[in-house]
């Protein structure tokens, strides 16, 4: 099966968001604006409480989904429907903003390490005004597939070729979301089909993809093909993200992602008038 080539490698961009939370943006930057259906990917990894205590106070979303994956630490989520919960170490929350939600994401700790990711996934026009909803799972509910050489694959969304299925369905874009750990010298291979866009987010160690060596905190955007192949130069951890492109216009400003300019303007108007 054809191995996917590398289209582009982009080093993550240090920035801050919310109330001063320090993070590295790996998708959603001038160098990598989006990769249909994925809009943005942030990695946050802070040992100093001052770099995360401000959290993400109340803010709106419409027209897409947010996926929060915690590696270390605890994050409390509250929204304007009265829903509340905590995402703990290894846990996942896949939230559909749909027609609109106002929520906060605040650290449930005042010391220790806070580490994880937030991914934004676009929705097709037919689902942008759907009802908000959640899929939430603790780490014990997320399967880990063991492979030769000590390679492990934590399957959050979708399923591996051998049938290990994550607790979250792929949704409208048939998304795959795998967290792969590779000991030095090992290889990870996975067919993802040639109808998905696929990217890698290297967040620990150093890997080789095709003919390129990739350092930590880099995004690797892959070309057409069937199989994703990663070689570990050192012990490494990598997210594999793949999804079917939506192929529709994207009008995106701040927390709203719509398919028309009129829809984007309406989102701002609805929020300002308290219609969320």
Swiss-Prot record:
This is Pirin-like protein CC_0481. InterPro entries: Pirin, Pirin_C_dom, Pirin_N_dom, RmlC-like_jellyroll, RmlC_Cupin_sf. Belongs to the pirin family. SUPFAM superfamilies: RmlC-like cupins. Gene3D superfamilies: Jelly Rolls.
